[in-house]
C-alpha cells in the first residue's frame, strides 16, 4: 500500500510533500515508520541537537545545519518529548508538518528507507555525515544545527532538510515520545538513535547511516557520533571528523566509519553469519513482520532482500559472500539455485497425545529409555493430555518417532498417539502485516546490540531496507495498548492520546483523522485498511473496538453524525468545540496537522461523507463502505460496544450538545470530551461501557453527536467509548451512530444501530415495552420534539434516535425511553465501552453493565441489545446511560446532557449535583449533564432529556408531556429522574443515579425501581425536596409523568441537572417499562418518590411527589394517587410508596449506592450510604446537608405519616394504585427480571420480579396485602414469598395493608397474571412487561402476557426453588432478611428458612428483607453475577437486601448486584423489600432489615425513631437494598 497521495506523503496525518528524490510510492510502512507514525508527531525538522536532546528521532532531522539556517528553528517545537537538553530547546523542534515543508528531504528520508535511497543516501550520507560532522562541529557553536541530509551535502548544512535522524520518533509504545535518555529507542529509518552513556547521541543505524540520513547528534557536544555498528554487540560510536572522514563510497561500511574495510574474512563471515542467523531466528521472526512479509509460501526469502538489510550491507555488499555464509549456516536453508534462503526449522519435539497428566513423568520417560531411541532432552506435560518430549535434533526426534510408531506402539494399554510437533516459526496471520510494520519492537540483534551502545535499543535497526522497522518506530508503532487488529493502524498523529486511548477508549481525536486528515492518519487508515484487510473502522477509532460499524451503515445519517473524523474527534478541525473539544491533550481547536484532503480517504472502505446540514461544522464522515454496505451486521454487537461508547461519549457530548444542541455539535463534542474526561470516572465507565452498543446512544448522539458520536464514538469507541465511537465511529460515527443518532431518528439510518439497538430496543421493547411504549409514545411525540431536541440535546437525540430506531423497531420507540434507555444505553454503550467489561454483558443482554455494573438494571432489557439498551437504559439510565437510557438520549444526555445540562441549564445546579454527588460527580454530571442535557437541554428540551423522560412522560401521560412542557426542569428533573431512574434505574444508578444524577442517579439508580425511588430519594437526596420529588416523580414520572408536573416546578434547576441526568428514563420512558419502573418505580418509585420525596422533599413534597408519582406511577397509579390526593395519597403512596420509598429510598440509596458502586459513579456519596444513601444521594446531589436533615425529618415525617397512611384505606386505594405501581414495579422488575431471566434465569428472576412487584405492592401496601398479593399472585412466582409475605404480614400484621392488600391482591393478581408482566398495573404495562420480562423482545404483548403468566407459573413452581436457591422470597426470606442484613447470603438463606416465620415478624421487614434478599441475591448473581456486591449489600442491611431483592426481582441487575452484597437476600429482599419495608414500618425491631425495607415505610415511621440507624441502614441497607430494589425495578 502506498502511503502517498498526489505527491504528498501523509505522515502522522500530516502531508509531506514528497520530493522528487523520494519515491512517491513509498510503502506505507516505510512512510509511516519513517514518520513515526506511531509516535507523537515526529519533529521532522527539529534541529538535530534538539532532536538528539529530546531524543526525538528527527525524521530527516532535516533541519540541516539549517537549524543554524533557522528553518528548523523557525518551526515551533512540536510536542516532542520534553526536550532533554538545552540544545533541544535551542533547536526548535519543528512539527512534522513544518519539517516536512522545511525539509523535503524528510520524504527523501522516508523514501530513503528504500534501498535505493539507502544506497544513494549511503554515499550521500557519508558525505552528509561528513558535512554533518562538519556542521556538528560547527554545531558545537550551534547546537541547533540539524543533521543535514546527504542529498544536500555540505550545502545541506543550511538546507539539508532531508538528513534527519529518522526515527519512529522515540515514541514509547504509548505513542508518546519517550524522553528516556539512554534507553530510548530511536527508530531511525534503519537504525536507532541512542545516547551513549557519556551523553553523546549515537545514531545506531545499520547501513542506514550510510544510506540513510540517520545521524545522531550529540545534543550537548553537538558532535555527531556515528556508532559503528559492527556486528559487534555494541555499536561503537565513532566520532566522525568534522569533515566526515568517512569514505562516502564505503557503500558497505558506515559512512561513520562502519566496519574496517579490512576485517579479516573469517571474522567477517562470522559476523555475517551471526547477523543473518539472527534475522532468521525464531526470536526475530516473531517480530520481523517485514521479513515475514517477504517470504513466499515455502518461507523462502530472496537472498538479495536479506543482503540489503542495513546491518548486512554494513558488513558487506558481496552477495556471493552472503550466500556462502548462508549455505554454511545450519540454521538456514538455501535453495538449490542459491537465490533464496529460509529458516531451517528444527522439528525436535514429539507430541504424545491422550496421555493424562496423572501419568508419572518417569513412566513417560521410560518410553524412550531404549537403546534404539535417542535420549530426550526434556519431557513435560503440555495440556489436553499431551506431553512434549524434546530431543536434541531433528534426527533424534525422527528416530524417536519411528521408534514409538514401530516398536512401542502402545502405552498403558492404549495405542501411542505421537506426532512430531511442527515448529512454525511464523504465525502468518494478519497480525503480521505485509508492510513490515512491527507490533513489537524488534528484539535487539545479537550482533549489534544497541543496548551496549548506550541505550539504542534497536541495534539491528530494521536492518533491511524493506524492513522499515524502526525499531523504535516499531515499538512505538504499536503502542502496546493500541490494539491494531492489524499493525496497519498507525495512530501516529496522536501519540498524546495513546496512553489514554490505548488504555481506555480512544480519544475522539484519534478518530478525527479523517476530518482532520492531517491530524490522524486514520485517513490513511481507510486506505490502509483497504489495502490491508483491516476494517477501516478499527483504524481510527477503536483500534480495540473493532466492531464493525456495519450496523451503522447509515452512511447518510452518518454524515450527520459526522465521520469518525467528525467534530467528535478532538482533532477534528471541524469541531467547533475545537479547543474545548476534548479532554484530550490536543485541543480540539487545534488545526488539523495538515488536513489531508478528503480524497485521501479515497481508500477502499471509507466513504467520506460531508455532512453539512445538521452538523454545525459540517463534518466529513468517513464511513467505511463496508459499514455502509452492511450496516446491520456485526454492528449490533459492535455497535453495542461502540455505541455504548459513543453513547457514553456522546452523552457528554449530548450534554454539551444538547446544550448547544445541534449548533454546537462540535462544541458538544468538545464538551463531550471534557465530559468524557469527567465521565472517565463515573460516566466514562458508563461511557466506556457500550451500554447498548451505543447504538441508541449514538443515535442520540447523533444529534449531539455528531461531534460526539464521532467523538464519543471515537472516544468511546476508541476507548470504547470511543471504541464505539470510533468503531462505531465507523459504525456510529462514521455510519450511523454519530450520524445515525441524529439521522437515526432522523433517518433511522441506524438500521445497523438498530441491530444493536434493536436488540437493545428489542430487549428494551420487551424489557422496556412499557418504557418503550411510553417512550415510544413519548418518543413519537417527542420524537418530533426530540428530533429537534435530540439534535439539540443528545438526550433527545438518543431518544430520537431511539425513537426513530425504536420507531423503526417499533416497540423500540415505545421503549424509546426504554429504547432511550436502551439508547441511552446505547449511548452508554459508548461510555460503556470504556467499561467494556460490562459491555459484553450488555451484548449478552442479560446483564447490562450499565456503567456501574448496572448490569442487571435492565436485566430485562438485557434480553438482548435492547435489554442491553434496556439495561443500558437502566444502565444508561443510570449513567449517562441512564440519561441515555432513559432518554435514550437521556443516558447520553445524562452523560452528555448532563454536562451539557450542567453547562446549560444546570450550570449552577450541576454543581450542586456535582458537588453533592461527589462520588457521583460523574453521575451528577451525568446527571448534570443529563440534567444538563436532559435538563438543560432537556430542560428545554426537556423533551430531550425528557425525551426519555418526556417520552416517558409523554408516553406515560400528559403529565409526561405536562411534566415536559410543564417543567422542562421538572421534566428534566423528571427526566433526570426519569432518566436517572430509567437511567439510574437502568443505569440511573450510575448516572442518573449518579446524583441525580445524584438524585437522578440515585433515582436513576433507583430509577427503575429506584428510579422513583432514586429519584425520590434523589429528591430526597437531592434535597431538592421538590426536586427529589420531582426526581422521584420523575422516576415516577418516568413511570408517570404526573410526578413531573408537580414536582417539576419545585426545583427544576436542580432537578434539571438531575433530570438531565435522569433523562435517561429508560425504564420510565416507556410506560410499560416505566411501569415496571413504575411498578418498581411506582411502587418503588412512588415509594421512593414518596420516600425520597418525603425524605427529600418533606412530606408535602413527598406527598406531592408521591401524588405525582402515584399518578406518574403510571396512569394507574396516578389515578390512584390523585385519588388519594396529596398527602394522604402520598401517605398511602408513601406507605406503599414510602415503603417503596423507603425501599426506594433504600433502593434509591441502594440503587444509587449500587449504582454508584456499579456505576462507579460514586454517585451516592457513599454509595448513597443507607439512609444516608438517600440522603447521601440527596446530599450528594443537592445541598446534602439540608437534604439529609430533610431526609431525616422527611423520613421521620414520612415514617409516621406513612405508617398512618399505610394503614389507611387511602393507602389501600392508593396502594391499589400503588400496587399497580407495585405491579408496575413488579412489572418492571418482572420485565427486568424476565429479561434478565431470559438472559439469566428467568425463573429466578421472574419470581423475583413477581416477588418484587408484589413485594413492592405488598411492601408498599403492607405485608399482608403483599401476602395476599403474593398468595394470590405470586403464589406461583413468589410462592415462597407468599409465606414470607404472609409472615411478614403477620409480623407486620399488615397494619396498613389490608386495604392495600386488596389492591395489592388485585395487583398481585395482575402481576401473577402478568407473571413478570405485572399486567395488573396496566394491561399494556403488563403486556409490555410481559414482553419485556419475557424478554422475548419480540413477543407481542399478548404473548408477553402469556409468557408472563407462564413465567408466573414457572415462578410459582420455581419460586420454591428460587426460594431455596435464591433464598427465595418466602417468609423464610423475610425472616432471614432480618438476619440477612446481618448474615451472608447463604446464612441469610438458611436463616430465612429457620427464622422465616418468627424472624419475619420480628424482623418484619427485616425478615422480609432477608427473605427477599436471598432470592434477590441469587438473582443478582444471575443477573449481575456479583455475589460480593450482593453480600456487601446484605451486609449493608436487610433492607438493602430487600431492596436488592426487589431490584433483582425487578430484574435490575444492578439491583441484583447490589442485592448480592446483601447476600442472596437482595433479590428476595427486594421483592419482599416492600413487604419488608412495610414490616419495618410495622416492626421497628427489624430495623436492620426493616431499615432496609423500612426505608420507605418504616424508615419513615420507625426509621425516624431510629432515624439514624434507619437512615444508615436504610441508606446503607436501603442504599444497597433500596437501590437494588430500585434497580430491580429499574431494570
Swiss-Prot record:
Domain of life: Eukaryota
Keyword DNA damage: no
GO MF terms, alphabetically ordered: mRNA 3'-UTR binding
Region annotated Disordered, chain positions: 112-148, 239-263, 533-605, 710-736, 748-768, 791-1135, 1160-1211, 1251-1285, 1393-1418, 1450-1531
Skewed-composition ranges (Polar residues): 860-884, 1068-1086, 1183-1200, 1467-1477, 1502-1515
Ranges for domain HTH La-type RNA-binding: 262-351
Compositional bias ranges of the Gly residues kind: 983-1004, 1164-1173
Residues with Phosphoserine modification: 1123, 1370, 1413
UniProt keyword RNA-binding, yes or no: yes
GO biological process, one term: negative regulation of cell growth
Example of a GO cellular component annotation carried by this entry: cytosol
Protein keywords: Phosphoprotein, RNA-binding
Compositional bias per record (Basic and acidic residues), positions renumbered to this chain: 1270-1280
Biased composition (Low complexity): 112-147, 565-578, 754-768, 810-826, 945-959, 1031-1045, 1087-1115
RRM domain span: 348-423
Biased composition (Basic residues): 966-975
Function per UniProt: Probable RNA binding protein. Negatively regulates myc at the protein level, via an unknown mechanism, and may therefore have a role in growth. Has no effect on myc mRNA levels.
Domain comment (free text): The HTH La-type RNA-binding and RRM domains are required for its function in negatively regulating organ and cell size.
Protein name: La-related protein Larp4B
Organism phylogeny: Eukaryota, Metazoa, Ecdysozoa, Arthropoda, Hexapoda
